C-alpha cells in the first residue's frame, strides 16, 4: 500500500485563479493523537490502517505538517442561511490540503475541518471540537454504508488544546474526502458581486471535471444546472426514505455533485414525526424533516439565479423544472421498495396511510420498517410483533388487511420479499443517543472503543449482527432530552 508521502497530488481547484480561495496553512495543534479512522475511506487513497501507526501521518492529519505536492487553501463562497443572503462565508475552519489521484484514476480532495483560522473565519477560532468531529465522522461513514451520496471521513485526530464553546472543550480535526467541495454558494458569491467571468470559469471547471459528458454540447450550462437539480432530487429522496434530517440546509451546505455535505446538528428519525426539527437553533422549523424536499427546491432556484448570467431566466427556470417530478419518482421508488411493493399509483395510498399511522401512534420509523420485512401476507390479523408497536391496533389491522392483499397480488413469496426488503430497510442507524454515548466515553474517559464499535456496526446497517441487538432498540427516555445545535 501507499504512504501519504507517496501520494500523487493533482490540485485542480488550487490551479484556478485566487478569486476562488485564499492560500492559508493550517494552525498546528499540540500533541495530536488518533481518535478513530475509516479503513474504507483510507482505501480511497490507496492507504491502509498501518499508515495511521506512523507519527508523521498523525502530524499531517493534525495540520502540523504539509507534504510536498500539497497546496493548502480555504475556499470562498457565500450562501442563503435560513433564507437570508450572507455575502461572504467561505471555509472558516476547513482547509483543503490538495487533491489526490488514486490508482483507479479517481480524484479525492483532502480537507481538514477544524484546521485553524482562515481569512473567512469571521471572528471564529477556526477550530472544531471533539464531539462534533466524532458525530461527523460516524455519520459520514454511516451514510455511505446506507448507499447515500456523501462526503467521506477518513479520520479524527484530537488534541488537548482547549476550545471554548458553551463550555471548555478540546480540539479535534476531521479529515474529509470528496471529489469536490464546490457548493451552490460557490456560484452565488460572484452573482451578488456582479462578476460574470468567475461564474463562467467555475462552471467550466466543474463541467470539465465532474460532468465531462456535457463538454461536447454547444451550450452546456443549462444541462449542467438540470443535472445538478436531478442529483439533488435523488439525494432528497434518499434522505426522506431513510429518515435523515440534515438540520442546516443553507445553500452553502448544498453540494454541486449531489452529496450530503457538512454534518452539523443532523438527526435520524426515532418516532416518526414529519415535523421533526433536529437543530435546536432552528426555532422556526425551516429545516424540519418534511420541509427538506421543498427547501432543496428553493435552494435550486438560488443556484439557477446565480447561473442566470450564463443563460436566460427562462432557460434557468426550465433547467430546474423537472425537480418536483424527479423527486416524486425517486421517493416513490425507494419507499415502494422499502414496503416490498412495485412503485405504482395504487401503492401511494398504502404508503401514505402507513406513515400517518406511524405519526399518529408515535411508532419508531426504522423499527417499523425492519419488522415489516417479516410481514406474513397470509395472516391479515396476525403479525403480532409489528401490531404491538401501535396503540390503535384496530387501525393497524385495517391497514394490514390492505397491505397483505397488495403483497398477495404482487405475487412474490414472503421469504424472497423479506430478504429483498432487508437490503432496503436498515436495522441500525446512527441514533443521537448512540453517538452521545460514544462521545461521552471519548471526552470523559479518553476511551474510543465505543466510537470504533459504532463505526463497525454502522458499516453493515442492513445485516442482523445479533451481538449488537441492543443498538437496534428504541432510544431510552433520557435520549429525548438530547439537543444538538450549530455550535461545534
Swiss-Prot record:
Residue runs in coiled coils: none
Pfam families assigned to the protein according to its UniProt record, in alphabetical order: SelO
Record-listed Mg(2+) binding positions: 253, 262
Top EC class for this record: transferase
Residues spanning the membrane: none
Keyword entries, A-Z: ATP-binding, Magnesium, Manganese, Metal-binding, Nucleotide-binding, Nucleotidyltransferase, Transferase
Binding site for ATP: 90, 92-93, 113, 125-126, 176, 183, 262
Active site per database record: 252 (proton acceptor)
EC number(s) from the headed UniProt entry: 2.7.7.-, 2.7.7.108
A molecular function GO annotation: AMPylase activity
Cofactor dependence: Mg(2+); Mn(2+)
Catalytic reaction list: L-seryl-[protein] + ATP = 3-O-(5'-adenylyl)-L-seryl-[protein] + diphosphate; L-threonyl-[protein] + ATP = 3-O-(5'-adenylyl)-L-threonyl-[protein] + diphosphate; L-tyrosyl-[protein] + ATP = O-(5'-adenylyl)-L-tyrosyl-[protein] + diphosphate; L-histidyl-[protein] + UTP = N(tele)-(5'-uridylyl)-L-histidyl-[protein] + diphosphate
NCBIfam families in UniProt: PRK00029.1
Family according to the record: Belongs to the SELO family.
Annotated HAMAP family: YdiU_SelO (MF_00692)
Function: Nucleotidyltransferase involved in the post-translational modification of proteins. It can catalyze the addition of adenosine monophosphate (AMP) or uridine monophosphate (UMP) to a protein, resulting in modifications known as AMPylation and UMPylation.
Official protein name in the record: Protein nucleotidyltransferase YdiU
Amino acid at each position: 500500500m501507499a504512504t501519504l508521502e507517496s501520494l500523487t497530488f493533482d490540485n485542480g481547484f488550487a490551479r484556478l485563479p485566487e478569486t476562488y480561495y485564499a492560500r492559508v496553512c493550517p494552525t498546528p495543534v499540540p500533541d495530536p493523537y488518533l481518535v478513530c479512522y475509516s479503513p474504507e475511506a483510507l482505501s480511497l487513497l490507496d492507504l491502509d490502517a498501518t499508515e495511521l501507526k506512523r507519527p508523521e501521518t498523525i502530524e499531517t492529519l493534525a495540520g502540523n505538517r504539509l507534504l510536498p505536492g500539497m497546496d493548502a487553501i480555504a475556499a470562498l463562497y457565500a450562501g442563503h442561511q435560513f433564507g437570508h443572503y450572507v455575502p461572504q462565508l467561505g471555509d472558516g475552519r476547513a482547509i483543503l490540503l490538495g487533491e489526490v489521484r488514486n490508482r483507479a484514476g479517481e480524484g479525492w480532495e483532502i480537507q481538514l475541518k477544524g484546521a485553524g483560522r482562515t481569512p473567512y473565519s469571521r471572528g471564529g477560532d477556526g477550530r472544531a471540537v471533539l464531539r462534533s468531529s466524532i458525530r461527523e465522522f460516524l455519520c459520514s461513514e454511516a451514510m455511505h454504508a446506507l448507499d447515500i451520496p456523501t462526503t467521506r471521513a477518513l479520520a479524527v485526530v484530537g488534541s488537548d488544546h482547549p476550545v471554548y464553546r458553551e463550555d471548555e472543550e478540546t480540539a479535534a480535526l476531521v479529515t474529509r474526502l470528496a471529489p469536490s467541495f464546490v457548493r451552490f454558494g460557490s456560484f452565488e458569491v460572484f452573482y451578488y458581486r456582479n462578476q460574470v467571468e468567475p461564474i463562467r470559469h467555475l462552471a467550466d471547471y466543474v463541467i470539465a471535471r465532474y460532468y465531462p459528458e456535457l463538454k461536447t454540447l454547444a451550450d452546456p450550462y443549462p444541462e449542467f444546472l438540470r443535472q445538478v437539480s436531478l442529483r439533488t432530487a435523488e439525494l432528497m429522496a434518499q434522505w426522506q426514505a431513510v429518515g435523515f434530517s440534515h438540520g442546516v440546509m443553507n445553500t452553502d451546505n448544498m453540494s454541486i455533485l449531489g452529496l450530503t455535505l457538512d454534518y452539523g446538528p443532523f438527526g435520524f428519525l426515532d418516532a416518526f414525526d414529519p415535523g421533526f426539527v433536529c437543530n435546536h437553533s432552528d426555532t422556526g422549523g425551516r429545516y424540519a424533516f418534511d420541509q427538506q424536499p421543498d427547501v432543496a427546491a428553493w435552494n435550486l432556484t438560488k443556484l439557477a439565479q446565480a447561473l442566470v448570467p450564463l443563460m436566460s431566466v427562462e432557460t434557468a427556470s426550465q433547467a430546474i423544472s423537472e425537480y418536483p417530478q424527479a423527486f416524486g419518482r425517486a421517493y416513490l421508488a425507494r419507499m415502494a421498495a422499502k414496503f416490498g411493493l412495485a412503485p405504482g399509483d395504487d401503492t401511494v395510498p398504502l404508503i401514505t396511510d402507513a406513515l400517518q399511522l406511524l405519526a399518529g401512534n408515535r411508532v419508531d420509523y426504522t423499527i417499523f420498517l425492519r419488522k415489516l420485512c417479516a410481514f406474513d401476507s397470509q395472516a391479515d390479523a396476525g403479525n403480532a410483533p409489528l401490531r404491538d408497536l401501535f396503540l390503535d391496533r384496530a387501525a393497524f389491522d385495517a391497514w394490514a388487511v390492505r397491505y397483505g392483499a397488495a403483497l398477495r397480488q404482487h405475487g412474490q413469496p414472503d421469504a424472497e420479499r423479506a430478504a429483498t426488503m432487508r437490503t432496503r430497510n436498515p436495522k441500525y442507524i446512527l441514533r443521537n443517543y448512540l453517538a452521545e454515548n460514544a462521545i461521552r466515553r471519548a471526552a470523559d474517559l479518553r476511551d474510543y472503543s465505543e466510537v470504533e464499535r459504532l463505526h463497525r456496526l454502522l458499516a453493515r446497517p442492513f445485516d442482523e449482527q445479533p451481538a449488537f441487538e441492543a443498538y437496534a432498540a428504541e432510544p431510552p427516555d433520557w435520549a429525548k432530552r438530547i439537543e444538538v445545535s450549530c455550535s461545534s
